[in-house]
């Protein structure tokens, strides 16, 4: 009788240790920021010139700025990057001249 009691009182322990979770292992999707058109390239109206967070580059002549600071061409022409006020950069679109 004593042996039977001992068998029913047997407690089994886990054979494998519990595995913790890691706080790493995730990343955000790429945002594809930066210049889409370089200096001297031709552009059409509405074409994106520069995608940015904040004003790294400022809009110049014939360039609009979206609510997410994306710079786009208002008219067809040639893209021109220029420095102003020391270290700031602006981008303009110089309209194409028609030779008719």
From Swiss-Prot:
GO molecular function terms noted in the UniProt entry: structural constituent of ribosome
Q: Name a biological process GO annotation.
A: translation
Task: Extract the ranges annotated as region (Disordered).
Answer: 17-39
- Name the domain of life: Bacteria
Q: Name one Pfam family in it.
A: Ribosomal_L27
Post-translational events: The N-terminus is cleaved by ribosomal processing cysteine protease Prp.
Point out the propeptide residues: 1-13
Taken from the UniProt entry, a GO cellular component term is:
cytosolic large ribosomal subunit
Instruction: Alphabetically list the UniProt keywords.
Output: Ribonucleoprotein, Ribosomal protein
**This protein's record includes keyword Cytoplasm:** no
PANTHER family, A to Z:
LARGE RIBOSOMAL SUBUNIT PROTEIN BL27M, RIBOSOMAL PROTEIN L27
Q: Which HAMAP family match?
A: Ribosomal_bL27
Q: Could you tell me which NCBIfam families the record lists for this protein?
A: L27
Family statement: Belongs to the bacterial ribosomal protein bL27 family.
Name under which the protein is recorded = Large ribosomal subunit protein bL27
Its lineage reads: Bacteria, Bacillati, Mycoplasmatota, Mycoplasmoidales, Mycoplasmoidaceae
């Amino acid at each position: 009788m004593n042996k039977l009691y001992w068998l029913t009182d047997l407690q089994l322990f886990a054979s494998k240790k519990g595995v913790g979770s890691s706080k790493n292992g995730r990343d955000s999707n790429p945002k594809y920021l930066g210049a889409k058109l370089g200096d001297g390239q031709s552009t059409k109206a509405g074409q994106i010139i520069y995608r940015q967070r904040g004003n790294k580059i400022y809009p110049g002549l014939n360039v609009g700025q979206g609510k997410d600071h994306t710079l786009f061409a208002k008219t067809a022409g040639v893209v021109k990057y220029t420095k102003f006020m020391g270290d700031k950069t602006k981008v303009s679109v110089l309209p194409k001249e028609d030779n008719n």
